[in-house]
Amino acid sequence: MTKKIIFTGGGTAGHVTLNLILIPKFIKDGWEVHYIGDDKGIEHQEIKKSGLDVTFHAIATGKLRRYFSWQNLLDIFKVGFGVMQSLFIIARLRPKALFSKGGFVSVPPVIAARLLGVPAFIHESDLSMGLANRIAYRFATTMYTTFEQEQTLAKLKHVGAVTKVTGPGSRSVTSKQLEAVLEYFDPNLKTLLFIGGSAGARVFNRFITDHPELKEDFNIINISGDPSLNELSWHLYRVDYVTDLYQPLMEMADLVVTRGGSNTLFELLAMRKLQLIIPLGKEASRGDQLENAHYFTTRGYAEQLLEQELTLPHFQEKVREVFAKQSDYLSAMKSSSELQSPESFYQLLSADISSATKEN
């Protein structure tokens, strides 16, 4: 009988990336893979784009808000309907396990899995749990965490950051597209790379547009998320989205200016890239990026600049500070033991699934 596993998670790329890393490993080992998500969400787009042999099952999903809104009443019914749909899907498929990467869409499948006696494994990327994972934790078999947690909860298992990004200098920059970029860059200048999430990138895009004088002192790479900004000109390369070019562009950068999303932060740690973190504040998020940034700065991996302090003089001062202490940051990153390869995490997850199914 073919072993089956269900993945869930979505809403943002960060809630899909790890799933896309793990799914090929399960397929290679003969598993039949299914995915529960929102058919209008990024998870559906990414699964289709991947070309992986995965059956996608769409469910209703509602946003879980931390504040009062009349929409909460409607979304309670959506979540409830999503649980009913998930119960039907999971009961029909009878999988050995469910793996969740979080996001609002993941809550109904995790609840349904628990009700049907299917082991549910969750991964939390941030220093503190989001609301979806706080709810899902109650129904989970195990929650894997990227960060060391101060709270001691029975079902938590710290595994570090799972990243497929390889170490520094492991790829050569040889593509024609990159060669074209290098023709516009000055080899005598430092290269800054700006990268933010879908919403977080807008502040960086505006900052670069408002301060063309940056190009006098630096080569600028701007991963903008906005195709209307695409440009290759004197000391400036703006591109909306990258896949194969992601790590080569990172290798080109002397310093990466980023938001505080944990996936990107740990990828930069794996590559030992100098980082200036400008996290989303509490007015635009639940404050998880501020916590992530604090974690990285206190361990000597990066420098932080708050968004409300993002002026050209402050930015230039912080950049100078990072370069002045470059050896300290690189030494701290080199001695870090917070990373785990996808293969080792897959082996751990497989062993935990086997153990949980034997107990059942």
Swiss-Prot record:
Name the encoding gene, please: murG
What is the designated name of this protein?
Answer: UDP-N-acetylglucosamine--N-acetylmuramyl-(pentapeptide) pyrophosphoryl-undecaprenol N-acetylglucosamine transferase
Q: Name one GO cellular component term.
A: plasma membrane
Q: Where in the cell is it found?
A: Cell membrane
The entry's family comment says:
Belongs to the glycosyltransferase 28 family. MurG subfamily.
List the InterPro entries hit by this protein, alphabetically.
GlcNAc_MurG, Glyco_trans_28_C, GlycoTrans_28_N
Q: What is its main location?
A: membrane
Q: Which SUPFAM superfamilies match?
A: UDP-Glycosyltransferase/glycogen phosphorylase
Q: What biological-process GO terms show up in the record?
A: carbohydrate metabolic process; cell division; cell wall organization; lipid glycosylation; peptidoglycan biosynthetic process; regulation of cell shape
Q: Where does UDP-N-acetyl-alpha-D-glucosamine bind?
A: T12, A13, G14, S198, Q289
Gene Ontology MF, one? undecaprenyldiphospho-muramoylpentapeptide beta-N-acetylglucosaminyltransferase activity
Stated EC number for the protein is 2.4.1.227
Question: So, what pathway does this thing act in?
Answer: Cell wall biogenesis; peptidoglycan biosynthesis
Output the superkingdom of the source species. Answer: Bacteria
Q: Name the catalysed reactions.
A: Mur2Ac(oyl-L-Ala-gamma-D-Glu-L-Lys-D-Ala-D-Ala)-di-trans,octa-cis-undecaprenyl diphosphate + UDP-N-acetyl-alpha-D-glucosamine = beta-D-GlcNAc-(1->4)-Mur2Ac(oyl-L-Ala-gamma-D-Glu-L-Lys-D-Ala-D-Ala)-di-trans,octa-cis-undecaprenyl diphosphate + UDP + H(+)
Alphabetical UniProt keywords: Cell cycle, Cell division, Cell membrane, Cell shape, Cell wall biogenesis/degradation, Glycosyltransferase, Membrane, Peptidoglycan synthesis, Transferase
Topology relative to the membrane: Peripheral membrane protein
Q: What does this protein do?
A: Cell wall formation. Catalyzes the transfer of a GlcNAc subunit on undecaprenyl-pyrophosphoryl-MurNAc-pentapeptide (lipid intermediate I) to form undecaprenyl-pyrophosphoryl-MurNAc-(pentapeptide)GlcNAc (lipid intermediate II).
